[in-house]
């Protein structure tokens, strides 16, 4: 509130974040607020065919070739409730196959403050269908995003209006299907529903 009062303009990346900025003022001298969505350079991230040589090389490097890949790519941090998400992932037992015979696997690409907890949980529960992959160079992000058959886009409960998972814009630009676990009224959920 202190910073907002002294600002000429407050920029947010979501409608729910505009509410977060304006609500503490209760209608009194609300700072001028604008929303500008995050974006992605469509010349850097775009859909690639599943037979793309570099997508196949990425899959092979991380043992994802010929598998159905459910991917989480980005910050493995506090705002994403990954400690609960991994418990959901645990319900899909190793060896589970899709209708076309591909094994279902989960890939977590990135790093962050809860990575060690999630890795430990996976080891302790013998979740052999989960793999962890380090952050990719920006130039290689197109291949890793296109390697996922479907992607998680999640936020922890109570984070609406505080955090906006900008990973969605890359997933949309790569035309990847998304499993959204997002609070009602949160910016990315609104975009998905629109």
Positions of predicted regions on the chain:
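Membrane-proximal helix-turn-helix segments that form the acceptor-binding/catalytic region
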Residues: 1-10
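Carbohydrate-associated surface elements
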Residues: 16, 36-39
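Charged active-site motifs of nucleotide-sugar-dependent glycosyltransferases
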Residues: 32, 64-70, 103-105
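Conserved donor-binding loops in enzymes that form glycosidic bonds
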Residues: 38, 69-77, 111, 134-135
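A short helix/loop element that forms part of the nucleotide-sugar donor recognition site in Leloir-type
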Residues: 46-63
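Conserved donor-binding/catalytic core segment of Leloir-type glycosyltransferases
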Residues: 64-80, 86-90
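Nucleotide-sugar-dependent
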Residues: 80, 130, 137-144, 151-172, ...
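Nucleotide-activated donor-binding/catalytic signature segment of Leloir-type glycosyltransferases, i.e.
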Residues: 94-110, 115-140
């Amino acid at each position: 509130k202190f910073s907002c009062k002294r600002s000429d303009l407050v920029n947010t990346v979501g409608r729910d974040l505009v509410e977060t900025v304006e609500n503490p003022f209760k209608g009194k001298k609300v700072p001028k607020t604008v929303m500008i969505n995050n974006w992605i350079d469509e010349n850097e991230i775009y859909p690639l065919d599943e037979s793309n040589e570099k997508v196949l090389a990425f899959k092979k490097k991380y043992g994802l070739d010929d598998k159905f890949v459910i991917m989480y790519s980005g910050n493995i941090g506090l705002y994403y409730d990954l400690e609960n998400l991994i418990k959901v992932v645990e319900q899909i037992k190793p060896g589970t196959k899709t209708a076309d015979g591909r094994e279902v696997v989960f890939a977590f690409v990135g790093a962050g403050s809860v990575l060690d907890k999630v890795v430990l949980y996976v080891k302790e529960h013998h979740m052999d269908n989960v793999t962890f992959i380090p952050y990719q160079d920006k130039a290689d992000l197109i291949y890793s995003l296109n390697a996922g058959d479907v992607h998680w886009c999640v936020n922890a409960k109570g984070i609406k209006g505080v955090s906006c998972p900008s990973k969605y814009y890359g997933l949309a630009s790569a035309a990847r299907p998304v499993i959204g676990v997002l609070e009602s009224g949160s910016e990315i959920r609104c975009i998905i529903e629109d």
